[in-house]
């Protein structure tokens, strides 16, 4: 990617950059007991404490300073973490009378990072789906796109739906408005090639509105990776084919965002 020439700004860079990363993990379980075990397993793997560590790493990667963290594990399942971050260092405001220090300008560049998890399942088909939604919203020069590669590796998803948009404007020293401060033609520009090769991808971009949307679906399908508690060799050929069809349909429905005919 070509570097955008640096422009001298008038005042503070108040462009808001929002990255929304939605990942899906699909699994097949034959019985209600197996389904409950899967949901318990996924709920434990992506508990609030681990999600907090992921978000701390995201904050570190984008050069942000953590101001506050709120986290919660839910019953019966699911977790949420919300983190308030700042581009500048954390500064304690003195209680004494007198002028405030210049560093208190960090109040202008508040940003936040959040994650919510949503385990769910089909009532009849044995399909269980785990979804995690991560939102990284920054104001100032911090770019949330710096953390995209790390987020992809952290969740190793079957399906990814990624949205990025830039809002607001800043000005150069002549008063000329800047509605974006970096080059981008696609979110794929920020995904390493070795990851792009693993996924089928679709872009829907509205360049004049600074809206970028990329959907990703894993190319390689190995039934063993989607069975919880047993292996493909434990299924008859017919069971394996039917299970594969159910899983592929589930993935296609999520990827294309619509219900599809049941061919099983």
Swiss-Prot record:
Keywords: Autocatalytic cleavage, Decarboxylase, Lyase, Polyamine biosynthesis, Pyruvate, S-adenosyl-L-methionine, Schiff base, Spermidine biosynthesis, Zymogen. One of its GO terms (cellular component) is cytosol. Pathway: Amine and polyamine biosynthesis; S-adenosylmethioninamine biosynthesis; S-adenosylmethioninamine from S-adenosyl-L-methionine: step 1/1. The modification Pyruvic acid (Ser) is found at residue 111. Its EC number is 4.1.1.50. Binds 1 pyruvoyl group covalently per subunit. The record marks 110-111 as: Cleavage (non-hydrolytic). Is synthesized initially as an inactive proenzyme. Formation of the active enzyme involves a self-maturation process in which the active site pyruvoyl group is generated from an internal serine residue via an autocatalytic post-translational modification. Two non-identical subunits are generated from the proenzyme in this reaction, and the pyruvate is formed at the N-terminus of the alpha chain, which is derived from the carboxyl end of the proenzyme. GO terms for biological process: spermidine biosynthetic process. Its cofactor is pyruvate. It comes from the Bacteria. It is an enzyme of class 4 (lyase). InterPro entries: AdoMetDC_fam_prok (IPR003826), S-AdoMet_deCO2ase_bac (IPR009165), S-AdoMet_deCO2ase_core (IPR016067). The active site is at residues 111, 116, 139. One of its GO terms (molecular function) is adenosylmethionine decarboxylase activity. It catalyses: S-adenosyl-L-methionine + H(+) = S-adenosyl 3-(methylsulfanyl)propylamine + CO2. Catalyzes the decarboxylation of S-adenosylmethionine to S-adenosylmethioninamine (dcAdoMet), the propylamine donor required for the synthesis of the polyamines spermine and spermidine from the diamine putrescine. Heterooctamer of four alpha and four beta chains arranged as a tetramer of alpha/beta heterodimers. Belongs to the prokaryotic AdoMetDC family. Type 2 subfamily. HAMAP family: AdoMetDC_2. This is S-adenosylmethionine decarboxylase proenzyme. The gene is speD.
